[in-house]
Curated annotation (Swiss-Prot):
GO terms for molecular function: symporter activity. Keywords: Amelogenesis imperfecta, Cell membrane, Disease variant, Dwarfism, Endoplasmic reticulum, Golgi apparatus, Ion transport, Membrane, Sodium, Sodium transport, Symport, Transmembrane, Transmembrane helix, Transport. It is a multi-pass membrane protein. Changing G130R: In SSASKS; uncertain significance. InterPro entries: Na+/solute_symporter_sf, Put_Na-Bile_cotransptr. It holds the Pfam family SBF_like. It comes from Homo sapiens. The lineage of its organism: Eukaryota, Metazoa, Chordata, Craniata, Vertebrata. Residues 1-10, 59-71, 138, 185-201, 256-270, 320-340 are cytoplasmic. This is Sodium/bile acid cotransporter 7. Belongs to the bile acid:sodium symporter (BASS) (TC 2.A.28) family. The gene is SLC10A7. It is found in: Cell membrane; Endoplasmic reticulum membrane; Golgi apparatus membrane. It is linked to Short stature, amelogenesis imperfecta, and skeletal dysplasia with scoliosis: An autosomal recessive disorder characterized by disproportionate short stature, defective tooth enamel formation, and skeletal dysplasia with severe scoliosis in some patients. Variable features include facial dysmorphism, hearing impairment, and mildly impaired intellectual development. Widely expressed. Expressed at high levels in liver and at lower levels in prostate, placenta, kidney, heart, lung, thymus and spleen. Strongly expressed in testis and also detected in brain, ovary, colon and small intestine. Weakly expressed in testis and not detected in brain, ovary, colon or small intestine. Isoform 1: Expressed in liver, testis and placenta. Isoform 4: Expressed in liver, testis and placenta.
Length: 340
């Protein structure tokens, strides 16, 4: 019974495993030209659905209300979309001499290029009791920035790997990402009261569509006899991903708790999660567009598929530790505050 409850709670993780297993058993269903016609249903309809859904769910009023914390927002966005990918690129120059599968290493670079997620960083920040408004702003604003910056970063670091012309990539991004997102925001203005009252399961809808994208991506992998993923590379990538997450969480903690940083303990909590978390919901569709038709797309996607559950797992484990630190710091501030 407890196992069923756990599976119900983590249904998306179970879904990823089942999607990959299903693709392994019968890859012909989800390949290009197959019964599912992913070149249409996934490349256009599924991706557009995810971003229309994002447009409906993103609360623009919360973006404007949190604008005053400019220093905090700059820190998070620069760390996420500049420092993170640049550091990963330098790290990969060292890893390139190892026997790790080169396409998994390229996949690590794509992780670095991704924007923050819309949900997980906010959920964990709230669980600790950190600056939730800042987390909401940076998750939403980072998603908007990511629509433009992430494809540019992917082309900057991995441009030679993509067989799709630059103009083709951005025209498809515009039609399947920007337009649905804007339409979603416009529709939201007219049905905002209904959305607040009914609270549709936006996360579950996007996650379900995402499972279809993951399934078809791995159908391409398993239908290609030239692709072989060795277990040694996979285990090393798993270790590297957890190491990267821990290192960057520690780094953001050190930077944001310096005496002259100007950040409160609650700000630090938002910084730790928002700066180090990466979006799977936005990332996989973007990889599908930027690397459309690429025979190694699924291998490139593997690190991001690992990073997503890893960041939730690691964040959840660290919630009690970070919370006790934040509470003790806040008590310390109150004790040192002069009484009148």
């Amino acid at each position: 019974m407890r196992l069923l409850e756990r599976m119900r709670k983590d249904w998306f993780m179970v879904g990823i495993v089942l999607a990959i297993a299903g693709a392994k058993l019968e890859p012909s269903i989800g390949v290009n030209g197959g019964p599912l016609k992913p070149e249409i249903t996934v490349s256009y309809i599924a991706v557009a659905t995810i971003f229309f859904n994002s447009g409906l769910s993103l609360k623009t009023e919360e973006l404007t209300s949190a604008l005053v914390h400019l220093k905090l927002h700059l820190f998070i966005q620069i760390f996420t979309l500049a420092f993170f990918p640049a550091t990963i690129w330098l790290f990969l120059q060292l890893l390139s001499i190892t026997p790790i599968n080169e396409w998994l290493l390229k996949g690590l670079q794509t992780v670095g290029c991704m924007p923050p997620p819309v949900s997980s960083a906010v959920i964990l920040t709230k669980a600790v009791g950190g600056n939730e408004a800042a987390a909401i702003f940076n998750s939403a604003f980072g998603s908007f920035l990511g629509i433009v910056i992430t494809p540019l970063l992917l082309l900057l670091f991995l441009g030679s790997s993509s067989s799709v012309p630059f103009t083709s990539i951005f025209s498809q991004l515009f039609m399947t990402v920007v337009v649905p997102l804007i339409i979603g925001q416009i529709v939201r203005r007219y049905i905002k009261d209904w959305l607040e009252r009914k609270k549709p399961p936006f996360g579950a809808i996007s996650s379900s569509v995402l499972l279809m994208i993951i399934y078809t991506t791995f159908c391409d992998t398993f239908s290609n006899p030239n692709i072989d993923l060795d277990k040694f590379s996979l285990v090393l990538i798993l270790f590297i991903i957890f190491s990267i997450q821990l290192s960057f969480m520690l780094l953001t903690f050190i930077f944001s708790t310096r005496n002259n940083s100007g950040f409160t303990p609650a700000d630090t909590v938002a910084i730790i999660f928002c700066s180090t978390h990466k979006s799977l919901t936005l990332g996989i569709p973007m990889l599908k567009i930027v690397f459309a038709g690429h025979e190694h797309l699924s291998l490139i996607s593997v690190p991001l598929l690992i990073y997503h559950p890893a960041q939730i797992l690691l964040g959840s484990v660290l919630v009690p530790t970070i919370k006790s630190w934040m509470v003790s710091r806040q008590k310390g501030v109150k004790l040192t505050r002069p009484t009148v």
